[in-house]
Amino acid sequence: MLIGFSADIGRYLGDTKENCSTYTGPRWAATAVYVVGFLLLDCVIHTAQASVRAMMSDLSAANHGPSIGQAIFSVWMAIGSILGYAAVAYGTWHRWFPSLKTSACCDACADLKGAFLTAVVLIVISTVVTMLLADEQSLDNEGVGGAAFAQTCGGLNAFIDLFASLKNMSPAMFRVLALTAFTWLSWFPFLQYNTDWMGREIYHGNPNGVADMADDKYNAGVREGAIGLLLCSASLGATSFLIPKLCRKLTSKVIWSISLFSVFLIMAGMVAVGVVSTKGYSPSLSTSLTVAGPDNLNALALTMFALIGIPQAVLYSVPWAVAAEVVAGEGGGQGVTVGAITIVISLSQLLVGLTAGPIDGAFNKGNAPAFGI
């Protein structure tokens, strides 16, 4: 809700009263609300995903192996992503529900608002269904682990236990965490800037909205990027069905290595496509270019979006499965393992978020430097 209504809230907090259709300057209050909303959203996502991944590892460890559980989780993530990207790819929420538009929130903002309101409804429905249908017996502290557990439980002790477990992890687990960190470092530039790359370097749009035509091209590119992410999620879901069999035949280590080499090739291709697209382009030529952009480069960019979903299926399943196998062999718990991996991923995301923008700005080459690194 904070993200969807950030522009309206920012207006009440002191942002410009000028209509959003004509104002192109910064809106700092709305930006602050937007950032807080995404901070809360990211916290909720990591909390939910970590719990579900640990549960899937526990449920599948006995008979099927961790790779099966993580592959199932990846399939459901892919299905949800396909539905989500399809909901925002065409930018028609503001036409279906004109009341979403305000003087502070124009078409693109109204589309975002509609998508997030739909997400709120789906979250409420899924929560109610889970609470009504899940047959779970509540256990008190005494029932779980006796008096000793009752004395050590609590939020602070949970962090103490986590860091104590990290200190006592085996060298094999530390190698898994290190490789996971480098893997996600290579992925986050794409995950964070994929639609921006499509809008700026393929469609030659201006995210600042200096001119209407440039702003239209950028938004058109972002929507096309959402279609690309839809294709990415489709290939991710299809590949997830093959991951367990491939891991049994070639081992998880080989599959992980192949996926990393695939990411290298695809990201290098995206850098090359971006350079070719922007070479010789001048903003003064924008009036002679169509909003749709160069068809051949569009098709090539969408193909790369679809192809990168294949190694993304490995990203969302194999590292977690490998960690679960290591911990299971050592007799440890899945919860601490998932928590450690989540921390490593968050640190990688933070590092990319703090450095990718300044690096791109220093070279003034769009997203190519971050993608290249």
Go through each PLM region and give its residues.
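Helix-loop boundary and gating motifs at the non-cytosolic
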Residues: R175-L179, T183-D212
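Loop-to-transmembrane helix entry
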Residues: G65-A71, D111, I202-S233, A299-L300, ...
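Intracellular loop-helix junctions on the cytosolic face of multi-pass helical membrane proteins
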Residues: T24-R27, T31-V36, T47-A48, V52-R53, ...
